[in-house]
């Protein structure tokens, strides 16, 4: 009896094992289809919030690729057969799988429920405003520039695009099932708006390239508000090949538009403003080629001297002794007060901790002699500033004496493309209108008769100033590195734009910067006329 029971149990166990094996074989077979469908999700693309210029033109997500999504149908197998280089897709479709791939021209595809095309955005398609926009890491996190400091505002408008469909256990799409498109804010217009003008930015970058400013910068500001319209730096780097540039001696990651450099003669209008605001009359002066202060001789850029010159000629020809003399008359306290009021020695807050270097300005204690004051008076000594700071200073002169801190962020764009603007701080009067008028008249002569004639154009009149600043730094050949500046505004009658150009290790402000100023200003003028 016991043996019979054991035998029966063995028969049951063997039968169950055989049945289990058969079921496993059947379920593993390609002929078996699960009655329970699986939802497959295929991500087509992700997108960060868009960065726009002041006119609503995108600075990111400017270009796109077309991706084709095809269900496994006979018609689609014929379709993909006609597409160059897509043989793999036909094989995929014939096996019953949903497929997607990029194509060059969506016009060649008739779209329907079985075949859909989608535009997939590329974050960066060019290098416009490279240094100010910055770049992101592989995970999309901002590393530098606007991408870093405004990441939270941008990320609020991130989106993704995917498709979902029913498939069997092997991933093959179920016949007759629809494809669900999941648009999670992907085609939203949301993002942020900057004060940059894409057209002016491109004009500025092209001018730097054409002017062979291989290491330098250019800034364009709106005269009335100091809104940053263009901000360019050279050399540039490749966003998709960061490692290549990490050890470059030219420091391509440095945004020279906001970094500080020796200033030189573009400080002379500040000295003039300090004297005029102190009710000192800027009279004629006899330049003999040098001036002595506290036992120190300071040379003029013209060895034999300029002779008797008035203020307009002193600005136009950039006479050093003239401004050394009037800086000592104005005094250290007034000179420093005026410089600070015009933005020297102060950091510029571009929002969200995007703060630029302050540059350097000597203290009152350091200006303890006529020689020290005179040295500052023509832009030398412990004085550095950025192209952005210099541009803001001259915007103040151009608009009649109101200093506005430069700004870059205009506000947030919602998903429908509507702007919620930020409130900008009111400017502050720091110079009288008469002081600005006197300086503007002198700067006009720089363009027509002085060191800035290379910027002259028949299209309009401009006010300009040049500088060639000593650095105390030397290249491998023992030649001192010069920082060459050119700054000005136009048109004279009602100034709208201020432009500041810097070239590192150049020849002179007039030689290097004037042609660049001319190209930028003429193209902006022509653009405004169209």
Model-inferred region functions:
Residues 1-243, 283, 333-341, 502, ...:
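Periplasmic/cell-envelope proteins involved in peptidoglycan metabolism and beta-lactam response
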Residues 58-60, 179-180, 222-265, 270-504:
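Beta-lactam-recognizing serine transpeptidase/beta-lactamase-like catalytic domain environment
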């Amino acid at each position: 009896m016991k043996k019979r029971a054991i035998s029966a149990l063995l028969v049951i166990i063997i039968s169950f094992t055989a049945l289990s094996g058969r079921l496993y074989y059947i379920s593993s077979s390609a002929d078996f289809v699960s009655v329970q469908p699986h939802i497959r999700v295929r991500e087509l693309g992700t997108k960060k919030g868009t960065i726009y210029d002041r006119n609503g033109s995108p600075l990111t997500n400017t270009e796109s690729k077309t991706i084709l999504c095809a269900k496994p149908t006979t018609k689609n197998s014929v379709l993909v057969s006609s597409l160059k280089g897509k043989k793999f897709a036909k094989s995929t479709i014939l096996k019953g799988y949903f497929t997607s791939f990029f194509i060059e021209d969506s016009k060649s595809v008739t779209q329907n429920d079985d075949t859909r095309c989608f535009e997939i955005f590329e974050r960066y398609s060019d290098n416009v405003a490279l240094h100010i926009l910055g770049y992101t890491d592989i995970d999309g996190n901002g590393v530098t520039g606007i991408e870093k400091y405004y990441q939270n505002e941008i990320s609020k408008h991130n989106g993704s695009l995917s498709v979902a469909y029913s498939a069997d256990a092997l991933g093959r799409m179920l016949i007759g099932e629809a494809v669900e498109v999941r648009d999670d804010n992907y085609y939203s217009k949301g993002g942020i708006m900057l004060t940059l003008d894409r057209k002016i930015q491109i004009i500025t970058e092209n001018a730097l390239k054409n002017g062979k400013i291989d290491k330098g910068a250019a800034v364009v500001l709106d005269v009335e508000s100091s809104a940053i319209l263009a901000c360019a730096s050279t050399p540039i780097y490749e966003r998709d090949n960061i490692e290549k540039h990490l050890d470059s001696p030219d420091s391509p990651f440095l945004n020279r538009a906001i970094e500080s450099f020796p200033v030189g003669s573009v400080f002379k209008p500040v000295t003039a403003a300090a004297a005029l605001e102190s009710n000192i009359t800027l009279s004629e002066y006899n330049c003999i080629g040098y001036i002595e202060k506290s036992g120190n001789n300071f040379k003029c850029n013209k060895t034999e001297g300029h002779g008797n010159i008035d203020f307009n000629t002193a600005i136009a020809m950039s006479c050093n002794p003239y401004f050394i003399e009037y800086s000592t008359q104005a005094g250290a306290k007034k000179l420093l007060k005026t410089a600070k009021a015009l933005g020297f020695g102060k950091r510029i807050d571009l929002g969200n901790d995007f703060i630029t270097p302050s540059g350097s300005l000597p203290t009152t204690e350091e200006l303890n002699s006529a020689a020290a004051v005179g040295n500052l008076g023509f832009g030398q000594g412990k004085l550095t500033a950025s192209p952005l700071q210099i541009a803001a200073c001259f915007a103040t002169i151009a608009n009649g004496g109101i200093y506005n801190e430069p700004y870059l962020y205009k506000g947030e764009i919602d998903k429908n493309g509507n702007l919620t603007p930020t409130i900008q701080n009111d400017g502050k009067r720091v110079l009288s209108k008469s002081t600005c008028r006197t300086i503007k008249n002198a700067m006009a002569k720089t363009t027509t008769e002085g060191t800035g004639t290379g910027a002259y154009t028949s299209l309009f009149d401009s006010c300009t100033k040049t500088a060639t600043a000593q650095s105390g730094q030397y290249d491998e050949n023992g030649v001192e590195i010069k920082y060459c500046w050119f700054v000005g505004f136009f048109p004279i009658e009602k100034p709208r734009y201020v432009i500041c150009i810097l070239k590192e290790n150049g020849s002179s402000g007039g030689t290097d910067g004037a042609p660049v100023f001319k190209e930028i200003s003429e193209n902006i003028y022509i653009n405004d006329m169209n």
